[in-house]
Regions:
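N-proximal low-complexity "stem/linker" segments adjacent to membrane-targeting elements
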Residues: 1-46, 50
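Cationic, hydrophobic amphipathic alpha-helical membrane-interacting segments
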Residues: 12, 33, 38, 100, ...
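Active-site nucleotide-sugar/metal-binding loop of Leloir-type enzymes
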Residues: 53-66
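Conserved catalytic core of nucleotide-sugar-dependent glycosyltransferases
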Residues: 56, 77-193
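Short beta-strand-to-loop acidic/aromatic patch adjacent to the donor-nucleotide binding site
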Residues: 64-75
Length: 254
């Protein structure tokens, strides 16, 4: 029977209400489907790599079958999680927008006649790195699609992924205070780290690094769940000039 370990790094011990609401609904939904769920929150760890590694360390002490990172600034539809579990992929994630407003896409949508109340649907900027990408590729929204890498903000990982990767990653002795008293001076495997990509010399974030070593060291695969509808919550500075009003474009006489 599947058992999902929800892991959330919470710097400052804070989360958004949308996240909490989704999480509580998810718990009820999984219980109704006879799927066990536990939550692990890590507070006040400023280094995200260390936070994720510590959460994995805690997960591996349990008998849970799947670990799912859900970050505290993600608003998700709980109904999207069970299909991710049933997809039976080693690593599967949802694609969420970056914390920015895609003004160019909003402008294009407005010019195309999209009603004002629907413009927010076009405000997101997404990064999707499909496998075998060639020009346009049609993706079925109800089936997993393989990708090179994805974000850990909403990612489900099977236990065997970490068990296979253990022998391929370094480890370190924990020297930080754990307020919960669960981690002493224990050895923790470094599944998440930053690294420089050899070919493009890009600095990889901890989630892209994880996906890369899973692919390179274990010939693993990473998948996206196109059906997952996610929001990425952040702060925004709201600007405006009271006296400024948009003017309609003037027609030019020929």
């Amino acid at each position: 029977m599947a058992k999902i370990f929800i892991a959330t790094p919470m710097y400052g011990g804070q989360c958004f209400g949308y996240f909490a609401q989704s999480l509580m609904t998810l718990q009820n939904m999984l219980r109704d489907n006879r799927v066990d769920m536990a939550c692990s929150f890590l507070f006040n760890e400023s280094l995200i790599q260390r936070a994720r590694n510590a959460l994995v360390h805690g997960f591996l002490k349990t008998d849970f079958t799947h670990m799912m990172f859900i970050d505290a600034d993600i608003h998700f539809n709980p109904a999207d999680v069970l299909p991710m579990l049933l997809a039976d992929k080693p690593v599967i994630c949802g694609i969420y927008p970056k914390k920015e407003i895609n003004w160019n896409q909003i402008h294009a949508a407005a010019r195309a006649g999209v009603p004002p109340e629907d413009l927010r649907k076009y405000s997101g900027s997404f990064v999707v790195n499909l496998i075998d990408y060639q020009n346009e590729q049609r993706v079925e929204l109800d089936k997993p699609v393989e990708i090179w890498n994805g974000g850990t903000g909403f990612m489900m990982i099977k236990r065997e992924v970490f068990e296979q990767l253990k022998e391929h990653v370094p480890s370190y002795i924990n020297d930080t205070n754990d307020l919960g008293g669960n981690i002493g001076n224990e050895r923790i495997h470094e599944f998440f780290a930053t690294s420089i990509e050899p070919l493009g010399e890009r600095l990889l974030s901890e989630d892209y690094h994880f996906c890369k070593i899973w692919r390179d060291k274990c010939q693993g695969s990473v998948w996206a769940a196109p059906w997952a509808q996610l929001s990425h919550i952040g702060t925004h500075k709201f600007d405006g000039i009271l006296t400024e009003k948009p003017q309609p474009p003037q027609s030019q006489e020929v």
